[in-house]
From Swiss-Prot:
This is Large ribosomal subunit protein uL6. One of its GO terms (biological process) is cytoplasmic translation. It comes from Ruegeria sp. (strain TM1040). Part of the 50S ribosomal subunit. Disulfide bonds: none annotated. Keywords: Ribonucleoprotein, Ribosomal protein, RNA-binding, rRNA-binding. One of its GO terms (cellular component) is cytosolic large ribosomal subunit. It comes from the Bacteria. The gene is rplF. GO terms for molecular function: rRNA binding; structural constituent of ribosome.
C-alpha cells in the first residue's frame, strides 16, 4: 500500500478543484493548473478533499497512485504558495542582470548568454550574483533553474559556475609538482 497515495490532499480556502474524466483542474490565487491521470488510478473530489485510489493491484497502478497524489499536492501548493529556486553565481567576472523579461548572463564566454523565461515562470536577479526562479508549476521552475545552471556548471577545482543555493560542490585538489 502506498504511504503517500493513501493520504488525501486537502484543498485550502480559496482553492477549488474540478474533475472531468481523468483530468483535474486546480484553481487558486496564483493561477490554474491541470493534470491528466493515467487509467491506473481514480481521482475523486468531495468536501474540499482530493482522493486518489488505484485501480487494481498491479505494480504500475501502485506506482501511479503515489505519483498522481504527489502531482495533485504540488498543484495545490503551486496555486497557493508557488515554488522558488535560488541560484548563486561564483567566479571572477560572472554576473547576471535582467533586461525586461530576459536574463543576461556574463559567464566567461566570448558572448553574453540571453535567457528568456517561459510563460508562467518569473526570473529575477536581486544581486549580480543571485538568480531567483519562481512560478506555480514545480516542474517548470525546476526545469528553468536547471537550464540556467547548465550554462556554466560548477567545476570541482575552484568551484566557479552557477549552483543552487546551499548546494555542496565536491572539491578536488590540483596537480602536485
Amino acid at each position: 500500500m502506498s504511504r503517500i497515495g493513501k493520504k488525501p490532499v486537502e484543498l485550502p480556502s480559496g482553492v477549488s478543484a474540478s474533475l472531468s474524466g481523468q483530468t483535474i483542474e486546480v484553481k487558486g490565487p496564483k493561477g490554474a493548473q491541470t493534470f491528466t491521470a493515467t487509467d491506473d488510478v481514480t481521482l475523486t473530489v468531495e468536501d474540499n478533499v482530493v482522493k486518489v485510489e488505484p485501480r487494481g493491484k498491479s505494480k504500475r497502478a501502485r506506482q501511479q497512485w503515489g505519483m498522481s497524489r504527489t502531482m495533485v499536492a504540488n498543484m495545490v501548493q503551486g496555486v497557493t504558495q508557488g515554488f522558488k529556486k535560488e541560484l548563486e553565481i561564483q567566479g571572477v567576472g560572472y554576473r547576471a542582470q535582467m533586461q525586461g523579461n530576459t536574463l543576461k548572463l556574463n559567464l566567461g564566454y566570448s558572448h553574453d548568454v540571453d535567457f528568456t523565461a517561459p510563460e508562467g515562470v518569473t526570473i529575477t536577479a536581486p544581486k549580480q550574483t543571485e538568480i531567483v526562479v519562481e512560478g506555480a508549476d514545480a516542474q517548470a521552475v525546476g526545469e528553468v533553474a536547471a537550464k540556467i545552471r547548465d550554462w556554466r556548471r560548477p567545476e570541482p577545482y575552484k568551484g566557479k559556475g552557477i549552483r543552487y543555493k546551499g548546494e555542496f560542490i565536491f572539491r578536488k585538489e590540483g596537480k602536485k609538482k
